[in-house]
From Swiss-Prot:
Residues that coordinate or bind Mg(2+): 61, 125
Chief location: cytoplasm
Cofactor: Mg(2+)
Role according to the record: Involved in the degradation of chitin. ChbG is essential for growth on the acetylated chitooligosaccharides chitobiose and chitotriose but is dispensable for growth on cellobiose and chitosan dimer, the deacetylated form of chitobiose. Deacetylation of chitobiose-6-P and chitotriose-6-P is necessary for both the activation of the chb promoter by the regulatory protein ChbR and the hydrolysis of phosphorylated beta-glucosides by the phospho-beta-glucosidase ChbF.
One term under GO cellular component: cytoplasm
Origin species: Escherichia coli O6:H1 (strain CFT073 / ATCC 700928 / UPEC)
Keywords for the protein's UniProt record, in alphabetical order: Carbohydrate metabolism, Chitin degradation, Cytoplasm, Hydrolase, Magnesium, Metal-binding, Polysaccharide degradation
Localization per record: Cytoplasm
Name of the featured protein: Chitooligosaccharide deacetylase
Pathway: Glycan degradation; chitin degradation
């Protein structure tokens, strides 16, 4: 049985080093898809690079934890910027959901303005769209716009609550991450998905070249290791040998 594998590189637009890494992993590796931060400091550079790589499917990386929002968000920003205090607000059930709804729509329109088309799918920076308070907003929006959504089903209490016409992969894995990146780890992710009987799988990744922005990230040099693994010819062969076909959210 042929299975669909979506290898999605997060953080397109974060920095030039991140952008170049994603393009390299698409052109000479197994990355088939990426998600862009429309408020990223290098988003214009990402748009420019993407024009020369039409095979790269591009979705939107909804941002609520970094940089400046596109709309006024007094309930979520501090000194005009977004940050990781969103976790505290979520725990206190104090998220400004109306502001978040408006910001999602604004980032979506900005994506279309930048890339000239709809995103293939939605996900989010630091997985904030999986917060119980935010997920229904994003799921409803994706279904209404006819675009797919990254869904990590582990935090979900009931798949039956999803909109009937919402598209997603059957499986999602964030396990290809950390200090022990290797081909063996990537293939283990595939094998685990196969054992669960999933016919489609998205694997998240963050391939990049290190620049000054990436140096400031808590997740820095493993991004280079990811790039090495994702451009390995032997990995591409092993994926095909396991019955996986590389594709994107266009295929779900």
């Amino acid at each position: 049985m042929e299975r669909l594998l979506i290898v999605n590189a997060d953080d397109f637009g974060l920095s030039k080093g991140q952008n170049y890494g994603i393009i390299e992993a698409c052109r000479n590796g197994i990355v088939t898809s990426t998600t862009a931060l429309v408020n990223g400091q290098a988003i214009d550079h990402a748009v420019q690079l993407s024009r020369d790589e039409p095979s790269l499917a591009i979705g939107m990386h909804f941002v609520l934890t970094m940089g400046k929002p596109l709309t006024a968000m007094p309930g979520l920003t501090r000194d005009g910027v977004l940050g990781k205090w969103i976790w505290q607000l979520a725990e206190e059930d104090a998220l400004p959901l109306e502001e978040i709804t408006q910001e999602l729509a604004s980032q979506y329109l900005r994506f279309i303005e930048l890339f000239g088309r709809k995103p293939t799918h939605l996900d989010s920076h630091h997985h904030v769209h999986m917060f119980p308070q935010i997920f229904p907003i994003v799921a409803k929006f994706a279904a209404e716009e006819g675009i797919a959504l990254r869904i990590d089903r582990q935090p979900l209490s009931n798949d039956g609550d999803l909109p009937a016409n919402l598209r997603s992969s059957q499986g999602f894995s964030s396990a290809f991450y950390g200090e022990e990146i290797s081909e063996a780890l990537f293939l283990q992710v595939l094998d685990d998905s196969s054992h669960r009987g999933e016919r489609s799988l998205e694997v998240m990744c963050h391939p990049a070249f290190v620049d000054n922005t990436i140096r400031q990230s808590a997740y820095c040099f493993p991004r280079l290791t990811e790039l090495d693994v994702l451009t390995s010819a032997s990995l591409k062969y092993a994926i095909a040998e396991r019955g996986y076909r590389l594709g994107s959210y266009h295929d779900v």
